[in-house]
Amino acid sequence: MRLSPRKDKYYMNNEVVRVLVTSPLGVGGVTNMMIHIQEHLDKSKINFDYLVFHDRHEPMEDKVLSLGSKKYVASADNVKFRPFRRIWRINEIRKVCKRNHIKILHYNADCAADMTNIIGAKLGGVQYITIHSHNAGFGAAGNGIRFISKILKPLIPLFCNNFYGCSELAARFLFPRSIIESGRCSVLPNGIDLEKYDYNEAVRREIRKKLNLEGKYVVGHAGRFSDQKNHSFLLDIFQAVHRKNPNTVLLLFGVGELQEAMKNKARTLGIEDAVIFYGASNEMNKMWQAMDVFVMPSLHEGLPVTGVEAQASGLPCVFSDAITKEVGLTSNTEFLSLQEKPDVWAEHVLKYMNVQRKSERKILEQAGYDIQQTADTFAQLYLNVAEKL
């Protein structure tokens, strides 16, 4: 879809270019990435606003407001019949975009069913839409989502102008073959602030003392408590780890609908005293330092930002083989089958007990994961787009 080369009042008189970003404002990988990008933008020229789909206060809301963002809500929470919520939200998004004269949208997508939201934005007058794939599978999604995605996937090139995938796998999952084969899609690494996440022994001692982890072998994980992240299997793995070495702790960051169920399972497995359900943290760069190994047995991922953050902090990482191997950036990463028993996983988790942590900053810089590179890509794209609208 070509943009007509005209000027719009919205971008005249040296106004700041506003890009509307879809992202929940909880503590999650994509949200953290967008905020890190925003922190590295020249906000006298370009800034982000956020579109959320639930009318509630969220952990990172105050942070984005302090960066000069506006928060827009397009909620269907009051619609009791779930199948109607997606239809209702189309109109809510249309109204938000029309009322606020939104011209540019950066849509962080999980699957092609998200096209209903993009259609709402288009109906609201949005002229330029980037769709950014962050997922590589449906996981536990119902047949309804799969069916809607199959129907709407061919419409993506009709409504969107720019196509990003956080990995090649994520791009192939979301976009039609025509987009992939024509070369219109780009892989954009999930950049992070490498200096902020770099291994720091002093911070490690500080956080381990604060959390009473001194002398412990800390198995860490960060992710929303949802089916996709596979916390149930993670607890099984840790039970095996703890049985082999009682001087171990499982440190979990995140919130979500399955959190209470996982607390109950930890009690059932008899490991509740060795599992810390920390909840959300806006200081994950420090929290990574306290861990000794990162374990991620997800059922599917695009390219997990948390996996990049963990490696940037010098952590060994054990991923499931359902995660793209593109995330394996450092030498201390491995991928295990979800069909393997927890005891096998436990052996791999424990083998890193004597690994000496070190900075991995140069390796991640060379791989393109410096947040400033990502921010520069965003700025160049949207400043050029704004000139043509």
Region annotations inferred by a language model:
Residues P5-Y11, L20-G28, N32-W88, E257, ...:
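N-terminal strand-loop element at the rim of the active site
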Residues G28-H36, Y217, H221-R243, E257-K263:
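A conserved mid-protein helix/loop that constitutes part of the nucleotide-sugar donor-binding site
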Residues R82-F84, R172-I179, G183-R184, P189-K210, ...:
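Acidic anion/phosphate-binding donor-loop and adjacent secondary structure
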Residues D110, A280, L299:
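Aromatic "clamp/platform" in nucleotide-sugar-dependent glycosyltransferases that forms part
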Residues L258-A261, E272-S281, M287:
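Active-site donor-binding acidic/aromatic loop of nucleotide-activated sugar
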Residues P316-S320, K325:
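Short hydrophobic beta-strand element within catalytic cores of glycosyltransferases
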Residues Q356-L389:
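A charged, aromatic-enriched C-terminal amphipathic alpha-helix characteristic of glycosyltransferases
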